Amino acid sequence: MTIKSDKWIRRMAQQHGMIEPFEPGQIRQDANGNKIVSYGTSSYGYDIRCAPEFKVFTNIHSTVVDPKNFDEKSFVDFHGDSCIIPPNSFALARTMEYFRIPRNVLTICLGKSTYARCGIIVNVTPFEPEWEGYVTLEFSNTTPLPAKIYAGEGCAQVLFFESDEECETSYKDRGGKYQGQVGVTLPRA
């Protein structure tokens, strides 16, 4: 498996719809010239953006977090240009970008250092061969203070790895439970 370059990412996005919407360069300022957390194509990856759709953990109903029987009341829905994650808490969001991963490609997604240096950890599992959808993002605030995340700005980087051969069974072939997700998607057992 080899990591893919900016040229490959641009070609796959523009000719095969791998990333939509797609930014061929690296954006570091908003339309008003204000600095933002960068997004778009980098040398060997793509910096994804957070959409203005969030689910923030709440303890109002005092339910147990069970991945096999998840209670949707564990989250409060929030829409906005930014989101405050309470101290030592957690939020879900989704990407602004929709992904279509080729059959011979696997991605790894890593949080951006701008957030990590503030104690905000972004976790995303790999995008498997032939998976498609909006990516659900997991944000952990590891600090004893409220933490702010921004919609429309970079939050993590996707690295693309192309295999020497196609897999026998892709995510699509096995009917993966998160195939085609369109919003912030909660755990499915």
From Swiss-Prot:
Signal peptide: none annotated. This is dCTP deaminase. InterPro entries: dCTP_deaminase, dUTPase-like_sf, dUTPase_trimeric. It catalyses: dCTP + H2O + H(+) = dUTP + NH4(+). Catalyzes the deamination of dCTP to dUTP. DCTP binds at residues 112-117, 136-138, 157, 171, 181. The keyword Hydrolase applies. Homotrimer. One of its GO terms (biological process) is nucleobase-containing small molecule interconversion. GO terms for molecular function: dCTP deaminase activity; nucleotide binding. The active site is at 138 (proton donor/acceptor). It comes from Albidiferax ferrireducens (strain ATCC BAA-621 / DSM 15236 / T118) (Rhodoferax ferrireducens). Keywords: Hydrolase, Nucleotide metabolism, Nucleotide-binding. It comes from the Bacteria. Its EC number is 3.5.4.13. Belongs to the dCTP deaminase family. The keyword Cell inner membrane does not apply. Pathway: Pyrimidine metabolism; dUMP biosynthesis; dUMP from dCTP (dUTP route): step 1/2.
